[in-house]
A protein has these predicted regions:
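Polytopic alpha-helical membrane proteins, predominantly small-molecule transporters/carriers
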Residues: 2-131
Length: 131
């Protein structure tokens, strides 16, 4: 289906939407929230035997990718993916430690700290590049 000539004005507006830098970062944050919720639902789905977490898993992942489809119109893919996966990894690890009582070893915590440093560095690099 060729959506370029799709008569629905909502589709046309979505196609034309290119987020500002602030909107792109906000959408990226929203994508991370959806991805983390989806990942928690993956754990709660118990191998897709629990219906609600299984459905929420797919819905949240779809929403995360939908947000990122707009983010990459403004931010570099390398920055988008690194921040998305880095922050998502840290948030998921923290939830794992807290909610699922997973072990929080010194090595795990140091590695999570390194991820945070990397995400801050990438965020700074993208802001320097934009100015």
């Amino acid at each position: 289906v060729d959506h370029a000539n799709f008569p629905d004005p909502m589709i046309q507006q979505l196609q034309a939407f290119t987020p500002t830098l602030a909107q792109a970062w906000s959408l990226l944050a929203l994508a991370i929230v959806f991805e983390v919720i989806g990942t928690v639902c993956l754990r709660l789905s118990n191998g897709f035997t629990a219906a609600l977490p299984s459905v929420l898993l797919f819905v949240c992942y779809a929403l995360a990718f939908a947000c990122n489809a707009f983010v990459v119109k403004t931010l570099d893919l390398s920055i988008t993916y690194a921040v998305w996966s880095g922050v998502g990894t840290v948030a998921t690890a923290i939830i794992g430690f807290w909610l699922f009582r997973e072990s929080a070893t010194t090595l795990k915590l140091v590695c999570i700290g390194l991820i945070v440093i990397g995400v801050v560095g990438l965020n700074t690099a993208s802001r320097v590049q934009a100015s």
